[in-house]
């Protein structure tokens, strides 16, 4: 019979996800139904992503928010515009505070991104379009780019 020593788990560094939620969701389908008949070509997608981190009142608790906006156009129409603010509440347990910025800007967004991606795909499909499947995002590269821009 095996036993689990829970005392060591209390001191192991780890990230705990306390909640995930939609803060704001908006979908505009301004040219429907005309735009739905003109789906013979692949639309141009303009995508923007931003990450906001908020230190919450409880020690080592943070809200990490993904702000994703996508606008789809073809030659004739603005097909749709979707904006999503999706967030998670994270507790960084037994982690050196010097590591918090990279964890909150890279690892935490990577943990909640698949859920935000699914919401966007479902909403665009429900609007009558092919589901918008956002490619995986390299949050590490975004973080390092932002840090290098901040230093200059």
From Swiss-Prot:
Q: Which GO terms describe its biological process?
A: protein folding; protein tetramerization; protein transport
| Assigned keywords, A-Z | Chaperone, Cytoplasm, Protein transport, Translocation, Transport
Q: Provide GO CC annotations from the record.
A: cytoplasm
GO molecular function terms listed in the Swiss-Prot or TrEMBL record: unfolded protein binding
- Please give the superkingdom of this protein's source: Bacteria
- One Pfam family for this entry, by name? SecB
What does the UniProt entry say about where the protein is found? Answer: Cytoplasm
Describe its assembly: Homotetramer, a dimer of dimers. One homotetramer interacts with 1 SecA dimer.
The UniProt similarity line reads:
Belongs to the SecB family.
Q: What does this protein do?
A: One of the proteins required for the normal export of preproteins out of the cell cytoplasm. It is a molecular chaperone that binds to a subset of precursor proteins, maintaining them in a translocation-competent state. It also specifically binds to its receptor SecA.
> What is the protein named?
Protein-export protein SecB
| Organism expressing this protein natively | Rickettsia massiliae (strain Mtu5)
List the lineage, top down.
Answer: Bacteria, Pseudomonadati, Pseudomonadota, Alphaproteobacteria, Rickettsiales
